[in-house]
């Protein structure tokens, strides 16, 4: 897997103009309808400064987009503003001119990179690109066709790790913390949708971790998510939640199960995670008309370079959707995690203790 340094070659992340966080008035959180109405009122007319939605990439190019070549000189093929482009060590966002089907020529000559010829499988997906006579195999880092989740082989059996985690205790913390006030997101705003992967086997470890498909956050963070969701409606989108509050014992299983080279994608239980504190959320966009999730540059919980929020690959539209999500969340006091475009931490996370309460033991008044 590529490192952060590999991604930094392409420059800093796209700058986003954040909108000042707006507070829901006192009492607005006392009911679902009150929170939603207040959020919608604040969101009216608020632009997220992400520019117009790009046109869809030409269908004939979709099977070509991806990574090719060895680890030390990765060639990324992506679409930008209606053109196919290449990124590699000696060129950044190099435009490719289409000569014929699957044959492209560099717009400006780069040593060893002039003509690119793609080879496809029977399904239309490129398996390699030949660059001036040198074949570069496709790097199959993404899920296979039809799949939406990459798997990680656990270092030890998950049931064994789960038993150990349930018997372990979170680290001791000293400080003046706020009392926990976990509330259910869908109770504040029913238009927020859920696809809680850890309540299913459709996750990176292929194991059910939650007894219920629910999403809880500390109240200020939850209300901020409601406001972000309201701002997205003018663009035709809503928020789809994959995970929110996560008991500490689950974080311990993730850490103990994950190989060292992929531990950047999981939190160290010795420190606890922001999910454990009820101030982190994993989410994406869904289309308000079709009710379907929006396709992003990578899949959720993908342990590859494609998961980074500044990864240059994919299509213009995929990156625009990623940028829109980030702008909405940052405008409400969240910060994106450097290795996961879907993970956002709320600004007050340090004010809450690590939590280890299972969903079915959260006070019913907050559920």
Task: Locate the predicted segments by residue.
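Short, well-ordered surface patches within globular domains
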Residues: 250
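Short active-site loop/helix that positions an aromatic residue
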Residues: 253-255
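Peripheral terminal and inter-domain segments
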Residues: 27-156
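Extracytoplasmic cell-surface/polysaccharide-interacting catalytic and binding patches
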Residues: 146-242, 257-339, 348-367
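Bacterial N-terminal signal peptides that target proteins for export
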Residues: 2-14
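Bacterial N-terminal signal peptides
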Residues: 11-23
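Conserved metal-phosphate-binding beta-hairpin within the catalytic cores
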Residues: 344
